[in-house]
Amino acid sequence: MEIIKISPRGYCYGVIDAMVIAKNASLDPNLPRPIHILGMIVHNKHVTDAFESIGIYTVDGANREEILDKITTGTVIFTAHGVSPSVKAKAAAKGLTTIDATCPDVLHTYNLILEKQAAGYEIIYIGKKGHPEPEGAYGTAPDVVHLVETKADIDALSLLSDNIFVTNQTTMSKWDVADLMDYIKEKFPKAIQHQEICMATQVRQEAVAVQAKGADLTIVVGDPRSNNTARLAQVSIEKAGTKAYRIADITELDIEWIKDAKKVAVTAGASTPTQLVREVLLFLEQFDAADKTTWKRAHNKDFERILPKMKNKYMAEKRRQRLAHLKNGGS
């Protein structure tokens, strides 16, 4: 069996930043306890379980305000996906200590929304309903933000102003966003469009579109709640023409998928620990369809290898530099 190790894959800088911020919090004796994360720090249960092992507890729910109702004391960490101003205000009113791990790329989009609101624009935001990033985007300016996910959502819009700004969730498929932006342009010809697919998401999608071509299947390692993971599987099917299966870890890999395969492509979502991908690759490298002793799939639960290994004392400055870079037109 030939294994195509699609590159780049796995952790992006926004995920690493958020995890380092949370790890640093666990090491800070001055922070009020308990320490909770408002939702999943990144969409991967292996990561949230690893943080729980060092006293950083995930509290999840339908939306950020509902989750916050469950937290009464201590410190709360806002996840990489971002939160609305009302959630931040509510946390402050409850007397909670807060730490913001929002990805700089997401913050940049939220800042754009605020700028366009101040300039008198209606904002069409392309995103996945129920995902925390669009929840935060909508909550940034609820009077002017209109969340759309499909062409039917766009058809249902009734905007009287010609001042329309269009942007999107950072982890969407760039092709889906382009298609919806084209559709919006037909209905609102004067709309200003600003695609906000983050570079880490974009290069991972492009890698799958090119490198998965010709494979018998693509295995995408990532949590079922990870939107960017789902988009990688979609890209494999729609752009590379290769069927794809998403697995949370090696234990979910079905032998039926691979026993007759000659070429298997492997990639991973931006919130997937390297350890989980390595287990899949090691399994495939030793797999022999004719030898059932090679079929055993076991995940080694090693939280220490999932969590970041060191504090980064320059994290805040690097995040400021990233935000400034994006504001100046960088990608």
Swiss-Prot record:
Q: Which residues bind (2E)-4-hydroxy-3-methylbut-2-enyl diphosphate?
A: 43, 81, 131, 170, 226, 228, 271
Q: Which Pfam families match?
A: LYTB
Q: Does the keyword 4Fe-4S apply?
A: yes
The reply to whether Metal-binding figures as a keyword in the UniProt entry is yes
Residues binding [4Fe-4S] cluster are: 12, 103, 198
Q: Which reaction does it catalyse?
A: isopentenyl diphosphate + 2 oxidized [2Fe-2S]-[ferredoxin] + H2O = (2E)-4-hydroxy-3-methylbut-2-enyl diphosphate + 2 reduced [2Fe-2S]-[ferredoxin] + 2 H(+); dimethylallyl diphosphate + 2 oxidized [2Fe-2S]-[ferredoxin] + H2O = (2E)-4-hydroxy-3-methylbut-2-enyl diphosphate + 2 reduced [2Fe-2S]-[ferredoxin] + 2 H(+)
What EC class does the entry list?
oxidoreductase
What cofactors does this protein use? Answer: [4Fe-4S] cluster
This protein's pathway reads:
Isoprenoid biosynthesis; dimethylallyl diphosphate biosynthesis; dimethylallyl diphosphate from (2E)-4-hydroxy-3-methylbutenyl diphosphate: step 1/1; Isoprenoid biosynthesis; isopentenyl diphosphate biosynthesis via DXP pathway; isopentenyl diphosphate from 1-deoxy-D-xylulose 5-phosphate: step 6/6
Protein name as it appears in the record: 4-hydroxy-3-methylbut-2-enyl diphosphate reductase
Identify the taxonomic lineage of the organism of origin: Bacteria, Bacillati, Bacillota, Bacilli, Bacillales
The gene it comes from is: ispH
